[in-house]
Amino acid sequence: MLWVLVGTVLPVMLLAAPPPINKLALFPDKSAWCEAKNITQIVGHSGCEAKSIQNRACLGQCFSYSVPNTFPQSTESLVHCDSCMPAQSMWEIVTLECPGHEEVPRVDKLVEKIVHCSCQACGKEPSHEGLNVYMQGEDGPGSQPGSHSHSHPHPGCQTPEPEEPPGAPQVEEEGAED
């Protein structure tokens, strides 16, 4: 029974991401930090009027290190990487008006609204959990994103880096000079 438990739990523990590192022995006076900074985000789409919204961006310094290997390798490689990224976010629909486009007078864009940031493992797979609510919709599969006018918070939700479509959103830090 004990061997079954060890054989099941041990591999899961080994695959789990290590906890973030706040201090390193080589630099005891330095600490990792990561915070959500207020920004003004410009949301745009080709042929539509852009909108400015208030959002947050993750900014910080998290630890990473790599210890040189040996060959043949006698121990496991000592590599660690943390990155400042969203720890809690939600999705919000931003509707853009598209004057002169009768067939598509408006476009709904899903925007990730960052609530909280923290140092997390660099290779951590993003969760699409918050996005699935809009893709599946509360009205069933195939519902359009515009059918929901509220956002859904998802603690611990990680989101993918958005692709850069034509007229992609621009991010300006609040208080930045023009």
Swiss-Prot record:
Its main location: secreted. Residues 130-178 are annotated as: Disordered. Keywords: Disulfide bond, Secreted, Signal, Tumor suppressor. The keyword Secreted applies. GO terms for molecular function: BMP binding; identical protein binding; morphogen activity; receptor ligand activity. Residues 1-16 form the signal peptide. GO terms for cellular component: extracellular space. Residues 34-123 form the CTCK domain. InterPro entries: Cys_knot_C, Cystine-knot_cytokine, DAN, Neuroblast_suppress_tumour_1. It is found in: Secreted. Pfam families: DAN. It comes from the Eukaryota. Most abundant in lung, brain, intestine and kidney. GO terms for biological process: determination of dorsal identity; negative regulation of BMP signaling pathway; negative regulation of monocyte chemotaxis; nervous system development; neuron differentiation; neuron projection morphogenesis; positive regulation of neuron differentiation; sequestering of BMP from receptor via BMP binding. Disulfide bonds join C34-C84, C48-C98, C58-C117, C62-C119, C81-C122. Homodimer. Possible candidate as a tumor suppressor gene of neuroblastoma. May play an important role in preventing cells from entering the final stage (G1/S) of the transformation process. Belongs to the DAN family. This is Neuroblastoma suppressor of tumorigenicity 1. It comes from Rattus norvegicus (Rat).
